[in-house]
A protein has these predicted regions:
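Generic structural signal of hydrophobic/aromatic residues within well-ordered alpha-helices
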Residues: 22, 33, 40, 56-63, ...
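Gly/serine-rich nucleotide phosphate-binding loop at the start of the catalytic core
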Residues: 1-79
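Acidic carboxylate diad motif detector
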Residues: 53-155
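Generic N-terminal simple sequence motifs
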Residues: 10, 87, 98, 376, ...
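Long, hydrophobic, amphipathic alpha-helical segments used as structural scaffolds
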Residues: 37-44, 91, 95-102, 168, ...
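Positively charged, helix-rich recognition surfaces that bind polyanionic ligands
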Residues: 5-6, 16, 20, 78, ...
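Stable alpha-helical structural segments in soluble proteins, enriched in small hydrophobic residues
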Residues: 36, 83-94, 349-359
Length: 409
């Protein structure tokens, strides 16, 4: 049985003494991160010297023995070591042009600690962390192998979470044999090739007036005052409610898709570029990237085939019946009639059907941009997919290693 790596995130409820202790630990790791980042930046700026986490780890041992820094010894050693390793990974991502330059951490932002090799602390559904004791969780620990690493975090609203990764057996479900194309949009979050339109909940837009009021109230509070801190937490909780509602809706949609369909075709959108253009707030509120991310890992978990169609394929301009392509289609034109076969199309439903057809054709090596067929000779995507899988079975060759996403184009 194949295994997959699954991540877990559980709500934690530390008591008063544990919260005070965690506050000191968060401050220590934040100080270590900022100090190490300042040393590395200054060393490269002045001497062109690139320091590593191992260099700073040796200095950390000396800092613990230096007068005025003995409080570092109160923090679990693994938490401090992992802090330096996280900074190493941040610099690796920067040098590989995946992320921007590491930044200094603020006191009011998200705080986290990482514990390695917790040993007997993982037993009988109870989590016991070094120097902290038993930590109360909102639910019992899953019955999985003891993880190598456990992270404890606190968000801006003051909520605590425990997260870890574990290998679990893949729970593949029997295929339904159904195929679907999914066209993402702002008026409707998702339009299926079956004709169903899923409305866009617009979680952020619906709460925007309340959020603006709370932000204005925060701006009027005096910096450093107790009332400002209370208002800051109120604003953070309001944003957390929006984020949780969005996540719940996306999980419900993606779970339904992977359970009801065996093949899912979506467009490989450049979400980052869309988020910088016109309507950026609405696009970020819709969370196209998060929806695609959930479909990717859930397709690997449960078995459906996820086809990602080339973003440059004009799915809205092709007739899904005869494959005729319009020269021009305005964005405000939601319906159009094919001049060749006379079919009246809903723009989004037609795009979803074309995404499914193009995904299956590209999987079969028959790109629709190079293939033109008449309406009577059009091969349905279900029949074409059956032909592809049958040819793979006869030849012993597979276009994919297993269930999961396949990027096309």
């Amino acid at each position: 049985m194949s295994l997959i790596t699954r991540s877990y995130r559980l709500r934690a409820y530390p008591n008063g003494a544990q919260r005070r202790l965690l506050g000191r630990w968060f401050g220590a790791t934040r100080w270590l991160w900022n100090t190490a980042l300042g040393i590395r930046s200054e060393a490269y700026r002045t001497c062109r010297l690139s320091l590593t986490g191992n260099d700073l780890s040796r200095w950390l041992t000396q800092w613990k023995r230096t007068a005025g820094h003995q409080w570092l010894a109160e923090v679990p050693a693994t938490a401090l070591t992992q802090c330096l390793r996280d900074q190493d990974r941040a610099f690796s991502g920067f040098f590989a042009h995946r992320t921007r330059y590491p930044r200094f951490k603020a006191k009011r932002g998200r705080q986290s600690l990482r514990f390695q090799d917790i040993g007997a602390g993982w037993r009988s559904g109870v989590l016991r962390l070094p120097k902290l004791g038993v930590l109360k969780l909102a639910e019992e620990l899953p019955e999985v192998e003891r993880p190598d690493m456990v992270s404890l975090s606190r968000d801006a609203a003051g909520a605590y979470f425990v997260s870890f990764c574990a290998e679990v057996p893949r729970t593949s479900r029997p295929g339904t044999g159904e195929l679907v194309g999914v066209d993402l949009g702002l008026t409707h979050l998702a339009t299926l090739s079956t004709g169903e339109k899923i409305p866009n909940p617009r979680h952020y837009q619906r709460r925007l007036r309340y959020l603006r009021q709370q932000h204005r109230c925060l701006a009027r509070r005096q910096k450093g005052s107790h009332r400002r801190e209370k208002q800051r937490v109120r604003v953070a909780r309001a944003h957390a409610r929006v984020r949780e509602a969005r996540q719940y809706a996306l999980h419900a949609l993606t779970t339904r898709l992977v359970r009801e369909f065996s093949v899912i075709a979506i467009e490989d959108l450049n979400v980052r570029a869309l988020g910088r253009g016109r309507g950026a707030r609405a696009i970020q509120d819709a969370a196209f990237g998060e929806l695609r991310r959930q479909l990717r890992y859930k397709s690997e978990w449960y078995g459906p085939l996820l086809l990602e169609v080339d973003r440059w394929y004009a799915s809205s301009k092709h007739c899904s019946m005869c494959r005729f392509r319009l020269d021009e289609l305005r964005l405000d034109q939601r319906q159009w009639r094919c001049p060749k076969c006379g079919t009246c199309h809903d723009r989004d439903i037609n795009a979803a059907r074309n995404l499914l057809t193009q995904g299956v054709r590209q999987l079969a090596g028959r790109d629709d941009r190079d293939l033109r067929v008449d309406a009577g000779d059009a091969c349905p995507e279900e029949q074409l997919l059956v032909q592809v899988l049958a040819e793979e079975a006869r030849s012993g060759h597979h276009n994919r290693a297993g269930p999961g996403p396949v990027r096309l184009g």
